[in-house]
UniProtKB/Swiss-Prot annotation:
Keyword Signal part of the UniProt annotation: yes
Disulfide feature: C43-C78, C74-C132, C121-C141
One GO BP: sensory perception of smell
Superkingdom: Eukaryota
GO molecular function: odorant binding
One Pfam family it belongs to: PBP_GOBP
Keywords: Disulfide bond, Olfaction, Sensory transduction, Signal, Transport
Protein name per the record: General odorant-binding protein 1
UniProt keyword Signal, yes or no: yes
InterPro entries from the UniProt entry: Odorant/phero-bd_Lep, PBP/GOBP, PBP_GOBP_sf
Amino acid sequence: MATVSKWRMLVLTLCLTGVWQVESSADVMKKLTTGFATALEKCRDELNLPDAVMQDFFNFWREDYELVNRDMGCAIMCMATKFDLVTEEQKLHHGNAHEFAKSHGADDSMAKQLVTMLHECETQTASISDDCGRTLEIAKCFRTKIHGLKWAPSMETILEEVMTEV
């Protein structure tokens, strides 16, 4: 009987640890999203982005929201450039992306995983010659991978974070 109780306690502990990791990963993604979004205003002004792009950002983490606006890709590329996350060739700068993730709460392992996912998405879309279109497809691929890991932050928590910073 005592052995069964120990096993139950072990399983419960492992489950709770797994839940905590998922929650903390979603929290890191929230911090990354809000940190990345700090460049949105500058890019919106520089690129004269339409309101539809702002709506796309508002709905970015919703799985059922279809991202189709090429301007969204232009905005993401502009924002990534502001944080030195891309090279002159418009490719992911692995070292800077890794450090950006760590500076927003990711541990080394999670930062590596995020960079790897972005690199995989970048590789899958390499045949797209239009930088904005390719960046949009990379973002869609990345969003799908994050949802697959159950790391996507809720829009409510992101909005709360953004509103408290205003």
